[in-house]
Amino acid sequence: MARTTPIERYRNIGISAHIDAGKTTTTERILFYTGVSHKIGEVHDGAATMDWMEQEQERGITITSAATTAFWSGMSQQFPQHRINVIDTPGHVDFTIEVERSMRVLDGAVMVYCAVGGVQPQSETVWRQANKYHVPRIAFVNKMDRTGANFLRVVEQLKTRLGANAVPLQLPIGAEDNFKGVVDLVKMKAINWNEEDQGMTFNYDDIPADMVDICEEWHNNLIEAAAESSEELMEKYLGGEDLTEEEIKGALRQRVLATEIILVTCGSAFKNKGVQAMLDAVVEYLPSPTDIPAIKGINEDETEGERHANDDEPFAALAFKIATDPFVGNLTFFRVYSGIVESGATVYNSVKQKRERFGRIVQMHANKREEIKEVRAGDIAAAIGLKDVGTGDTLCDQNAPIILERMEFPEPVISVAVEPKTKADQEKMGIALGRLAQEDPSFRVHTDEESGETIISGMGELHLDIIVDRMKREFKVEANIGKPQVSYRETIRTRVNDIEGKHAKQSGGRGQYGHVVIDLYPLDPEGPGYEFVNEIKGVVIPGEYIPAVDKGIQEQLKSGPLAGYPVVDLGVRLHFGSYHDVDSSELAFKLAASIAFKAAFAKANPVLLEPIMKVEVETPPEYVGDVIGDLSRRRAMVSGQEATDFAVKINAEVPLSEMFGYATDLRSQTQGRASYSMEPLKYSEAPKNVADAIIEARRK
């Protein structure tokens, strides 16, 4: 089957923005103008096509990136048909994992900004992710019809807050209620869309008289940006010659692909103005799969390999999202980097080292799907029937195995206990949590050995709320949520010698007798955690009872004498004791050992250890004082600061118990413009006042 669209006419793009910049509405308009969707879905009616999970429609926010395919030939049908694969990405900070994951598989991105709110905090996080993966991008300043809309202010913020070399491609005609259309600064013509057919048709008109001067000024700014692409064009420009439209567009495209500039378009998706011209910009300025460097990977022999966007190379694809579909089970979204694969073919999962069979392959439009026979280099599609494929796995030709760059996923930062409301929910909850963890690598589940509770961990409070909500809706599991928990540990600080433990019951008949003498000493935290040394000389204690002594002490380690937390980093030396021919038994020596251990532990300067997190906060410079002040109140040790042009990174070590609710506090301190990450670092001694309070609470 031949390729229907040449790969040079593919555009794999993400639409990315802060919550409420109007990103989902923008995507809806793309689907409408490209002829995919006949009735425009409005977010504020809860009917948007891309937001297909129930919680998304209720909360009006996008949680899962739905991938969809559309075709576009230009506003005036001026191009051959291009295939645009659109990935809609979430804009909430608890879902950055989804954004990060889709950045991996995109070739270009459209950053949507609100003309009133401008560059918001999450836009800064998304921007950093796009930089990390060198994604060429253009900007769309949306909501030009809103009160307070100001296009040039947003362009300025792109420069100052993000350090972007922002170059307007258009200027708005009017703003707020008076927003009429845009001026195309390359053609120097006004574009007015027809309101009667929801903007499907438009006219090129002369630039309004009161805008001629400002348009000239920004037209020159655009030409200058184009001329900087090569010495040849620069000479032509400085020599006073006019550049042709082709030269201008070619030069701008070259600079966008090199991520040297970001072209800025504008409009109001809600009012059906501007998205059409932004689609033209996607085709004209964003890369096709062949414009970006070959993807790197690791061959079977650990050498570096790569795959070019070419049908003739061996098949290689990256699974970037797993979604559970109510009708077909798991859908694995994947991006094909090279080669061709047909439905029914067997491929190799090089990360798990297993073979997988592609059952059916579907192309998604939001959550409707169309079955296709094959996919080729550059395609984005979803497979049904893959058994054991996780996010970030590589699917490839069995005869040419390669592992494409692995994605790095952040460690979860918050944990809570969940318990099913009824016995019937118990088993269903296990299945539901397993499914959700497979879909979302930033969500983890484990059973706490000490309490037996099921603990779920994720990227923030909203993240876990939504997980619990999905358990309820999709899997019909009712669960109660506990308070966030911290795991403490206990240990000793000084050595104690010759501590005795005796268990004797000898009041006639078969008695019980065990007697041990031990030393207790601290071990290095990097060491084994526990050691038992038997130094019994002669037969003061017969050899068969020695393991019972060790076992008696190990049982005590599970729940320490201070507050019932696990005991770590200590050693025991057994060096004396006595026994009775008739009354001694394993049980008696186990009990004697536990008596000796408790007595020794109490004298060995016992302390409580608390988990310390390594925390990194990235904040605009103006909030550094507030952020550090707040961290100090949380008993943080700030270990360093590092400033870039637009943000300051603060590194600190903070006790986990002080970090609950931090995401919310940090948002309010910095108007939501800071982001943070944290990971477990070490255990260290809790200050006396903190330890006393914890011990007191546990004893109640």
UniProtKB/Swiss-Prot annotation:
Places the protein is found: Cytoplasm
Cellular compartments per GO CC: cytoplasm
Superkingdom to which the source organism belongs: Bacteria
GO biological process, one term: ribosome disassembly
Signal peptide: none
SUPFAM superfamilies: EF-G C-terminal domain-like, P-loop containing nucleoside triphosphate hydrolases, Ribosomal protein S5 domain 2-like, Translation proteins
Residues annotated as binding GTP: 17-24, 88-92, 142-145
Keywords: Cytoplasm, Elongation factor, GTP-binding, Nucleotide-binding, Protein biosynthesis
CDD domains noted in UniProt: EF-G, EFG_III, EFG_mtEFG1_IV, EFG_mtEFG_C, EFG_mtEFG_II
Gene Ontology MF annotations: GTP binding; GTPase activity; guanosine tetraphosphate binding; translation elongation factor activity
tr-type G domain span: 8-290
Keyword Cell division tagged: no
PANTHER family attached to this UniProt entry: RIBOSOME-RELEASING FACTOR 2, MITOCHONDRIAL, TRANSLATION ELONGATION FACTOR G-RELATED
Function: Catalyzes the GTP-dependent ribosomal translocation step during translation elongation. During this step, the ribosome changes from the pre-translocational (PRE) to the post-translocational (POST) state as the newly formed A-site-bound peptidyl-tRNA and P-site-bound deacylated tRNA move to the P and E sites, respectively. Catalyzes the coordinated movement of the two tRNA molecules, the mRNA and conformational changes in the ribosome.
Family from the record: Belongs to the TRAFAC class translation factor GTPase superfamily. Classic translation factor GTPase family. EF-G/EF-2 subfamily.
Protein name: Elongation factor G
Gene: fusA
